[in-house]
Structure formats: structure tokens, C-alpha cells
A protein has these predicted regions:
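Hydrophobic, Leu/Ile/Phe/Ala-enriched alpha-helical segments that form helix-helix packing faces
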Residues: 110, 148, 190-197, 246
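Alpha-helix boundary/N-cap detector
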Residues: 72, 76, 97-101, 159, ...
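Helix-rich alpha-solenoid scaffolding regions
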Residues: 175-199
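Amphipathic, alpha-helical segments enriched in basic
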Residues: 85, 112-119, 123, 139, ...
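Generic hydrophobic, helix-prone segments enriched in Leu/Val/Ile
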Residues: 43, 80-90, 143, 164, ...
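Amphipathic alpha-helical/coiled-coil segments positioned at domain termini
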Residues: 1-32, 38-40, 124-174, 200-247
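Domain-level detector for long, ordered catalytic/regulatory cores in large eukaryotic signaling
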Residues: 1-134, 148, 153, 244
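Hydrophobic core segments within long, regular secondary-structure runs in both alpha-
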Residues: 103-111, 162-165, 186-191
Length: 247
């Protein structure tokens, strides 16, 4: 088997005490770092002083400040990890970068595909990845990527990509029974992806977004729903209206 400063500045700091390592002007989380999960009780008791400046007022209202704040699937996975994978393949370190001919082959295969009308966008070239939207990254992860990459990239890279693809597919499943049946498998796949991506792309790949994947299944379990139901995606098109109201 392919095995908020009251809260914290991000979900990851509210979910674990793992300390990253600074390298190449970024904080990375290697497989050698020690990981200890945060919990609601210790957060309410102000036991994470390195991440808390005071006891959150939310605690007074019995709001659980770790489990009740979900990771956002759209920014974490689509615009985070998947985008990072493609940028590493296109402009990353030499050991993991795809050749121009490989990029061209994948792009040509993408162009040859015609997606049904249920998809918001048709496929675009990897040479245009800087302008891809969140929906395009999802389509690549779940549908087109597994097809166009299979005979182009090496087996290890493909298995690593597929681990993420299958895990996310499970966590997006709308049927509660089917999702619950395979959630442990998705958890194992994400752990495999995080470890394997360090090997495939190098230590600098495993930044906050990548490491946070190991906590993604917790939101499925806590909220008892698909990641689609707790994603910021549905609100994205209304941000301009909110900006106009607060000017």
C-alpha cells in the first residue's frame, strides 16, 4: 500500500508542536522533526505559550480552538501543494525538474483533452501554470494529471502524485459512508506523500502547506463532511463585494 495571535497565525500551529527548520529562507518540516499533536484542552489551559500571547476569549464560550478551526482545502491543496508540485517540476531543483521535452509532452497531452461541460475550465499548458486557477489545479490533481503523467514522469514521482490524488479524492467524497470507509487509507496516503515528497523533491519542498496535509483528515472526522463543504472556495467569488463594503 502506498503507504489563528490569540489562536495562532495558522492552523498548523494550533494542531501540533512540531518545530520546523529554517533552510533557504523558508521553514521546512523534515521527517526527522519531532511531531506532537495539539489538543483543545491544553490550548484552553494556555499550555502552548510559544504560540499563544493570552488565553483566547473564545475559550470562555466553550469554543474549541484547535479542532473547530479547519484547514482550507482550496488554499492548502489546490493553490498550495498542487501548485507547488507543478512549479517544482517546471522551475525547481535540477534533480526533480522535468526536462523541456517532458513539459512539452505533458502540455500536448493536456491540450489533446476535451473536458465535459461540468468542468469550469478546459485544460491549459504547463507553460501557463502561473495563470492557472484553483479549479484547474483540482482538475489536474484528480482527473487529468493521473492520465497525462503516467508515461512521462518516473515511477516514484508518479506514485507520490497518485497518493495525494487518491487521498484527496477520498476526502472530497460526498457519500458519508464511502468516505468514512476509506478515510484511514487517505490518512496513510497523505503521510506517505509527505515523506515521499521529501525524497522526490528535496527537503525544501516540505513547507507548511505540505506538512499540514497530515492533519487534513481530522477536519473530515470532526465536521463529518466532505472537504468541499468546509472549503473557502464558494466564498471566493464574493470577496470583491466584501472589499467594497469595508472601504
Amino acid at each position: 500500500m502506498v503507504e489563528p495571535r490569540l489562536l495562532s497565525y495558522d492552523k498548523m500551529l494550533t494542531t501540533n508542536t512540531r518545530v520546523g527548520t529554517r533552510k533557504d529562507h523558508r521553514i521546512i518540516f523534515t521527517s526527522h522533526d519531532v511531531h506532537v499533536a495539539h489538543n483543545d484542552d491544553n490550548f484552553a489551559k494556555f499550555k502552548y505559550e510559544e504560540h499563544q500571547t493570552m488565553v483566547s476569549p473564545l475559550v470562555k464560550y466553550n469554543i474549541t480552538c484547535v479542532s473547530s478551526f479547519s484547514l482550507d482545502y482550496m488554499h492548502l491543496v489546490r493553490l498550495g501543494v498542487v501548485r507547488r508540485i507543478l512549479f517544482f517540476w517546471k522551475t525547481g531543483p535540477h534533480h526533480c525538474r522535468l526536462s523541456h521535452s517532458q513539459l512539452t509532452e505533458v502540455s500536448e497531452l493536456l491540450h489533446a483533452l476535451t473536458l465535459p461541460q461540468e468542468f469550469a475550465c478546459q485544460t491549459r499548458s504547463l507553460f501557463e501554470v502561473e495563470w492557472w486557477k484553483a479549479t484547474e489545479f483540482q482538475s489536474f490533481l484528480l482527473y487529468t494529471g493521473p492520465v497525462v503523467l503516467k508515461k512521462v514522469i518516473c515511477k516514484k514521482s508518479y506514485e507520490t502524485f497518485m497518493a495525494l490524488s487518491i487521498a484527496v479524492g477520498i476526502m472530497l467524497e460526498a457519500n458519508a459512508e464511502e468516505r468514512a470507509a476509506y478515510l484511514d487509507y487517505a490518512k496513510n496516503l497523505l503521510s506517505y506523500f509527505v515523506c515521499s515528497s521529501e525524497e522526490v523533491f528535496g527537503e525544501t519542498f516540505v513547507v507548511y502547506n505540505v506538512h499540514s496535509l497530515v492533519h487534513l483528515h481530522e477536519d473530515n472526522e470532526h465536521f463529518q463532511c466532505s472537504l468541499n463543504e468546509i472549503s473557502a472556495f464558494k466564498f471566493e467569488n464574493h470577496l470583491q463585494q466584501i472589499k467594497q463594503l469595508v472601504r
